[in-house]
């Protein structure tokens, strides 16, 4: 039996972002009976208690509330508890898979302990976290140093994007790397235009099928909301811009409003978050075009979902995005007027089925969870 300890996500069941969804899908689509997953779960109330989720052994870690440093303490406590389990249960050849770079600067001592019990350390750097503008300069410097420490000391660095793997290879030549993509759900929405749920939602926001452009994603500056909204407002389209994000109570919302005055354009509609997956898929499938502005990171889950559900995708042209969407999308830059011109061009057209078919073919070939989980299981069972 190969035991894999997964550390660095908030845990299961998945309720948050990319890492949590990845872990959920990894255990949900488990194919081999020779694998046993142990998943750290951040808790505010319980410590070192166990529960089972989709066959995985989940354990809670009650990390002290230290502000941004809490995640570092969480990872440290989780690793120590996993080491304790390995010793008590006499587990041989365990794999410790750490997601993210937060603990990186302190990884050296843990590498020795992991190797001392016959274990291997695999890490996933989570894109270029240190480049995110939400971090202060000191935090960015720490994250860059943490990335360096983990890349140079891990037994294997797993990247979910070819661009990230290339960056790791170029930046840290001694690092051993492996590319395994992120996955996505390809299931089409079961809802139809006649369903009451759809009509209620569309009437609430005064929307019509194919009558809107769409943005979905974390509400942070590096996702280029300012450029996308400013350029949309410059365009001549009569369609709306629907923005699905966590803007409520976010200071960036007021900053963005002051910079762009989007509240003066009735086409721009911030509609909050949508947690109903079936509804979100319908909204994606019936948008005229999806605008993807993510600039930092690896394979973005939102881009994969767009390629799987939307025919026309207008994507910010960085290497990370191009390596995924390839020729199935149109690309834009931050140059003034570039995206507005692209919107004006596509707005006059109507048939983008060929692009959509190409995008879905890319997803089916390279990004289904079944394929991704199969690659991870092959790695876990044979790499060490």
Language model region names:
Residues 45, 184-185, 216, 239-255, ...:
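Glycosyltransferase donor-sugar binding loop
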Residues 5, 199-223, 229-236, 242:
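Conserved donor-binding/catalytic core segment of Leloir-type glycosyltransferases
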Residues 7-15, 29-68, 163-171, 248-252:
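N-terminal strand-loop element at the rim of the active site
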Residues 139-157:
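Membrane-proximal helix-turn-helix segments that form the acceptor-binding/catalytic region
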Residues 329-337, 344-350:
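Conserved acidic donor-binding segment of nucleotide-sugar-dependent glycosyltransferases
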Residues 282-298, 311-312:
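Acidic donor-binding loop of glycosyltransferase active sites
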Residues 72-84, 93-126, 298:
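An aromatic- and histidine-rich active-site surface loop
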Residues 152-189, 376:
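A short, active-site helix/loop in glycosyltransferases that binds the activated sugar's phosphate group
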